[in-house]
Amino acid sequence: GDADLSLRFDLTVPLAKYVALHYADLAFPFRRYQIGKVYRGERAQRGRFREFYQADIDIIGDGKLDITNEAEIPSIIYQTFSTLGLKRFQIRVNNRKILNGFYAMLGLTDKAGDIMRTVDKLDKIGAEKVRTLLIDEVGVSAESADEILKFIAITGSNDQVLSALEGYAGRNETFDEGLDQLKTVVKYLSAFGVPEENFAVDLTIARGLDYYTGTVYETALLDHPEICLLYTSDAADD
């Protein structure tokens, strides 16, 4: 007929429909996992496919989820990879509230999404080209671009990065909330048995979609950087 049809883009929309239909029958927080084929209408190239398997792990709350749930997912990533015999992998953790709060300190709240999407290209194009894009395309000043690159370049042990972030605390409520959440996630990841060699606070991690509101993660094989990200995860309040 004339019906508009499409192949399944992801496993998230079907999950949202399922929760909406069975809301009264579910016990919250509702945990589930699913593996299935999904499809993307993009140009096929190395590391990008039009058809592939996606594995989803989700925790759905009836209201606001406790921050400890945001540490549960990366601990499952660690258990999964370890069970598969993979050892040299790293779960990179950040919090969107930290980024939004920092950009608000610079007076760039309205450009935060564009900044994050530009910074997301750092591994591919390098810091100098990211700086150029921030100035020429996003429209931030050269001074702000330098502040952004300085901020996302903070590295070290997890304790060292968190300590450096303390230097920015007290100037923005959203930033402070994100920092508290990130500290809690790091604490619980250790409590759940994830070695620090397998997870790191990484301020370049943002994820591309604006509905991500809290903890964000990406996972990569350290010995095979040419392989695209194997596992990504994000927290969303809505």
Give the location of each predicted region:
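A short, hydrophobic C-terminal helix/tail in secreted or cell-surface proteins
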Residues: D234-D238
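Acidic, His- and aromatic-enriched active-site or binding-groove loops in soluble protein domains
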Residues: L108-A127
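Positively charged, Gly/Ser-enriched RNA/tRNA-binding surfaces
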Residues: D2, D10-K87, K97, L133-L229, ...
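Charged, often glycine-rich, active-site loop that binds/positions anionic groups
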Residues: G1, L106
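Short internal beta-strands
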Residues: I91-V93
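A short acidic (Asp/Glu
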Residues: G101-A104
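Glycine-centered helix-coil hinge/cap
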Residues: G126-K129, E173
